């Protein structure tokens, strides 16, 4: 009989651990692995098409590009080539696919030291507007009017 599958927690990572604990965790990671970037990748709360990842925390080389990281996430979700998804930084920014993780860390790291990314399918947004708000609001703040 196979072992039971681990079901990802429903609560976001930031709500599961205090700021101090997260900062301590990042400090330990960065001290031990100075060339790695601590990244938390979570499914958009209203996502229904894409599967949950088996883990949320990733330690990635700083020279890795977003294209390469996207490929890693895609393979962990076991998506077909025709299945597309967005990977948003801080729940609101689509970043350049040629950007390195070091650049993303420099520009988008949270106060706790993690970089937070959210993935969602195009179907989740359900409208023709750009997925990334240009006004600085997060996706939850934007109404999406049906056609």
From Swiss-Prot:
Origin superkingdom: Eukaryota
Q: In which tissues is it expressed?
A: Most abundant in placenta, lung and ovary.
Q: Where is this site: Cleavage?
A: 126-127
* Positions where Phosphoserine occurs in the chain: 93, 96
Please report which positions carry a covalently bound lipid of kind Phosphatidylethanolamine amidated glycine.
Answer: 126
Q: Recount the PTM note.
A: The precursor molecule is cleaved by ATG4 (ATG4A, ATG4B, ATG4C or ATG4D) to expose the glycine at the C-terminus and form the cytosolic form, LC3-I. The processed form is then activated by APG7L/ATG7, transferred to ATG3 and conjugated to phosphatidylethanolamine (PE) phospholipid to form the membrane-bound form, LC3-II. During non-canonical autophagy, the processed form is conjugated to phosphatidylserine (PS) phospholipid. ATG4 proteins also mediate the delipidation of PE-conjugated forms.
Q: What is this protein called?
A: Microtubule-associated protein 1 light chain 3 gamma
- Keyword annotations of the record: Autophagy, Cytoplasm, Cytoplasmic vesicle, Cytoskeleton, Lipoprotein, Membrane, Microtubule, Phosphoprotein, Ubl conjugation pathway
Query: Where does the record place the Phosphatidylserine amidated glycine lipid attachment?
Result: 126
Which cysteines in this chain are paired by disulphide bridges? none
**Pfam family name, one:** ATG8
The entry describes its oligomerization and partners as: 3 different light chains, LC1 (a cleavage product of MAP1B), LC2 (a cleavage product of MAP1A) and LC3 (produced by one of the MAP1LC3 genes), can associate with the MAP1A or MAP1B heavy chains. Interacts with TP53INP1 and TP53INP2. Interacts with CALCOCO2. Interacts with TECPR2. Interacts with TBC1D5. Found in a complex with UBQLN1 and UBQLN2. Interacts with UBQLN4 (via STI1 1 and 2 domains). Interacts with UBQLN1 in the presence of UBQLN4. Interacts with TRIM5. Interacts with ATG13. Interacts with MEFV and TRIM21.
Q: Does the keyword Membrane apply?
A: yes
Q: Which residues are annotated as pro-peptide in the record? A: 127-147
- Bilayer topology: Lipid-anchor
A GO molecular-function term, please? Answer: ubiquitin protein ligase binding
* Native source organism of the sequence: Homo sapiens
Q: Which InterPro entries match?
A: Atg8-like, MAP1A/MAP1B_LC3C, Ubiquitin-like_domsf
What does the UniProt record say this protein does? Answer: Ubiquitin-like modifier that plays a crucial role in antibacterial autophagy (xenophagy) through the selective binding of CALCOCO2. Recruits all ATG8 family members to infecting bacteria such as S.typhimurium. May also play a role in aggrephagy, the macroautophagic degradation of ubiquitinated and aggregated proteins.
Keyword Repressor carried by entry:
no
Recorded GO cellular component terms are: autophagosome; autophagosome membrane; cytoplasmic ribonucleoprotein granule; cytoplasmic vesicle; cytosol; endomembrane system; microtubule; organelle membrane
């Amino acid at each position: 009989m196979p072992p039971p599958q681990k079901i990802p927690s429903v609560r976001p990572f930031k709500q599961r651990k205090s700021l101090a604990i997260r900062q301590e965790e990042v400090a330990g990671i960065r001290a031990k692995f100075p060339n790695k970037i601590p990244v938390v990748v979570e499914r958009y709360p209203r996502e229904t098409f894409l599967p949950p990842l088996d883990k949320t925390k990733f330690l990635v080389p700083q020279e890795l590009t977003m294209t390469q990281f996207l490929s890693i996430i895609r393979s962990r979700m076991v998506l077909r080539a025709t299945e597309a998804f967005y990977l948003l930084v801080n729940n609101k920014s689509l970043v350049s696919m040629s950007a390195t993780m070091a650049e993303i860390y420099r520009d988008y790291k949270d106060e706790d030291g993690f970089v937070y990314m959210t993935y969602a399918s195009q179907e989740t947004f359900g409208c023709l507007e750009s997925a990334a708000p240009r006004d600085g609001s997060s996706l939850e703040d934007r109404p999406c009017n049906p056609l």
